[in-house]
Amino acid sequence: MNTTLPALRSTRRSRLGARFFALVVALAAFVAVDTTAHTPAFAQNIYSIYSAFNGPDAPVPEGQTAEDVENYVGPSDFLLDKAGTFFYVAEGDAGRLRRVRADGTAAAESIPLPFKPNKMRFFPGETKLAIVGGGHKGRLAIVEIAQASENPDAAPEPLPMRVVADYPIGHTPSDVSVKRTDDGRELVYATLQFENAALEIDAATGEIVRRWDVGREPFCAELTPDGRRYVVAGRITDKLANVSYSCSAVRVIDLDANEVKKTDLLNGHNLLTDMTLSPDGKFAFISAVQGNYLSVTSQVSGGWIAENVFLVVDVETCEFVEVFFLDDEQLGAGNPWGIACSEDGKRLVISLAGTDEVVFIPLERVLKTLADRPEWARPGFGAYMYSSFATGEVQLPIRLRVKFGLKGLRQTIVRGDDVYVLSYFEDAICKATLKLSPPYEYYPNSYVSQETPPRLLQTDAENADDRPDDSAEEAAAFAKIAAETASDPNAGPPLRFVELEPRRPLKGVEISRSFARLAPKPVLTTRRRGEILYHDATACFEHWQSCVTCHPDARVDGFNWDLLNDGTGNLKNTKSMLLSHETPPSMISGIRADAETAVRAGFTHILFKKADEKNACAVDEYLSSLRPVPSPYLVNGELSESAKRGKVLFESDRTGCAICHPAPYYTDLRLHRVGSQDVNDYIDAFDSPTLIEVWRTAPYMNTGGFHTVRELLLEGKHGARDGRLDKLTPQEQDDLIEYVLSL
């Protein structure tokens, strides 16, 4: 075996003895909150809160106009046809589908979609698209885009785009794949994030042919090239948090046998975001985060709290195989997102949404690393292998990082030497081209740094609006074209790629960079700036993590963390940020008086980089704008009959639930002693959280010790240690639980 073959970890710090250190514990006094002094900002029931967000008259933040709020394209996915002629862009914020020539020689075309799109795939032959989206009212649209050419070797001939079918499929579709069977049937495979399900759908009728339980929050999925297996990755852990082993899971559905296999990942693997398969379909590569939740959050250096990785799963056996680290020793690769392979199997490319970078990886060397693993190596062995450049010959580094500076880099496409990356926050497509001219000669490091110290290539969060500017000439040309197409709502400007300075990480390697706007450079509202900052790992010291590392979608990651604000050794379950600014105090222990205080403390003590007040206020604005996602337990947006009965019980003296959890926020904003104190806790009273969206915030309580609301109420006797819930009939217990899960 070639012992010099590197894995993707540059120099892994030794952890031997690293957890033995002294800590200073500050004791905090708790201040009672006057509930009468806090005036709710929303209407008096949770259903009007839903409609305020999901209805046509969504609230506009103070000081902004509706035009500001709705003026983003927000591309959520894109495809490039096999001929390399057309990009198809799903405009997640604008609710449209765009087709634009890749060479920039013609204006774009677009059509409105019946919902806001999330993901899409070509049908075989590239004459149609399958598009899923729509959030809690999830749908599948079939869009005709072309007709097959009479010449079987020629590309399809474009047609005016039109929606030919639109089917309801379930709550929050998160990914989609398509296949054509031997008998000519077209089947669509989709995952439903908040129904924990995968679907097989007949594209001709919209009928759901098969449905599988695939665990918590399936977020990304791929169909193997032979169409026999469907690989599904859960976004966050589905395990208890008060344990020493917690992680997300990957499942493989054998479509022929109709069987589902599951593999757990390594401890701490979470936030699985995107997936691609090796060209032969043998391996699934998944972008993810390694959460070191057993560490005290006393520092962030060297990935102490979180590291950034991609995972390898054997598709046929459904076994976890390996983890490869994307970080460098003193510079994290925060929040990996899009991941894609080249068709020739030579290159793997990953976008880093948190650091505005793209990572080039020689896929052949990854596969060789896997093939050369000794038989005795356990899964994850490569996590502890050092990157060491070959001494006999100069090779390409296993990892090349190139900075774009555009925010929200997400979905990725690889075509030969060209890489395209979608920039969600910039309404843009980025392009990088890798040019190799061996022999190679190393510069001192593997960064795309040329003669500039690598740290200077990073964009600090203090300048979140410091993004690449279009040249005056390009901006004028863009404005002219935009004006010419403004009268036609279905037209748009052509792609005009603006060249950025090329990067040369080592002699013999050049990476050209450019980007093309889908619309004029977005004018950021305060709320949008806050959203960008929340996703920005450059706001963190050494760029290891962002707020979404522990709070995806500003909700929960399912882990317990040991924050220093209330001592050490007493881990607490991650809280959702939903309504945090409306329901003080903050933190489970109530240690922060309000969310504004918590936001500023989070920058200082979790990201270890102080934010200026302007940026902190922007994050406040973003978090304050969050609205609940309607529960999957609702029926057509309303309480079920069971939940209606449960509501009566919830508000009655028989249960007393509404004493601590009164509407409209389902919290009295106070600390309570409910018997949930852990042996390591310094306090015995904890914040009464909002129950809104409690259906998605498991595991429950400060300890994260209950999988379900049923376990919490009936086994944990939460708030009912006198046994009052035991006196309910089984039907009444079911009704009460149904209501709580409907909030």
Regions found by a protein language model. Give the residues of each.
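Short, solvent-exposed loop/turn segments at conserved positions within beta-propeller repeat blades
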Residues: 92-93, 135-138, 193-194, 240-247, ...
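Periplasmic c-type cytochrome electron-transfer domains
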Residues: 273, 286-287, 291-298, 306, ...
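Residue-level detector of Asp-centered blade-edge/turn motifs that repeat once per structural unit
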Residues: 82-83, 124-126, 180-184, 225-226, ...
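A short helix->beta-strand "capping" segment at the edge of beta-propeller domains
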Residues: 42-74, 321-325, 389-405
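Surface loop/turn motifs at the tips and blade-to-blade linkers of beta-strand repeat domains
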Residues: 67-71, 110-114, 166-171, 211-214, ...
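Beta-strand-rich domains and repeat architectures in extracellular enzymes and scaffolds
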Residues: 63-95
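Hydrophobic beta-strand positions that form the internal "hydrophobic ladder"
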Residues: 87, 129-130, 188, 230, ...
